[in-house]
């Protein structure tokens, strides 16, 4: 195995190890998010993007080269030509075909796992953010529920107070009705008393008029009696 393919194979093994490490169930996404949030990653972010694209290009080139080698050594004409020249050429061609196929698988899976690794890191980051947002939303929901319960309790208190106010209002209305009825009764009684007083005043005036008439009649009769008495006395004196 040449140095370049040994490096690609080592890169493939490292990718497999990282993918298995990311898939461990006892390491939560929040822990990976903290690791990804180190300041060193921010400093090499621009370099990392360039390196990512460079590695993809190199792996694509190696993959295409491996495809070319596989097609080259898989050709029937090449195998027959080598077999006709040297008897051991067939085994040599098959060995090169095996190496080409191995290199094809190494470069292909390295390219595939490299893309999977990038996507896996993105998904872990998004999952950690979603979990954090879920925690924040859970806290907000709990606070909202507490506030809603508090508002409901205050609403019940207000309803109870309103009911008490309504009861007091009904009592006040009943008392007001009673007072109005008492007022009407007092007005009726006052009117009756006023009518009775007016009638009594009229009776007094009538009696006063009658008394004056009787007094005048009495004075007239008394005057006539005096005159008659004087006449009688005068007649008695004349008869003597």
UniProtKB/Swiss-Prot annotation:
It is a multi-pass membrane protein. GO terms for cellular component: endoplasmic reticulum membrane. GO terms for biological process: apoptotic process; endoplasmic reticulum to Golgi vesicle-mediated transport; intracellular protein transport; protein localization to endoplasmic reticulum exit site. The chain crosses the membrane at residues 7-27, 44-64, 104-124. It is found in: Endoplasmic reticulum membrane. Residues 1-6, 65-103 are lumenal. Keywords: Apoptosis, Coiled coil, Endoplasmic reticulum, ER-Golgi transport, Membrane, Protein transport, Transmembrane, Transmembrane helix, Transport. Highly expressed in brain and testis; detected at lower levels in thymus, spleen, liver, lung and bone marrow. Homodimer and heterodimer with BCAP31. Binds CASP8 as a complex containing BCAP31, BCAP29, BCL2 and/or BCL2L1. Interacts with VAMP3, VAMP1 and membrane IgD immunoglobulins. May interact with ACTG1 and non-muscle myosin II. Belongs to the BCAP29/BCAP31 family. This is B-cell receptor-associated protein 29.
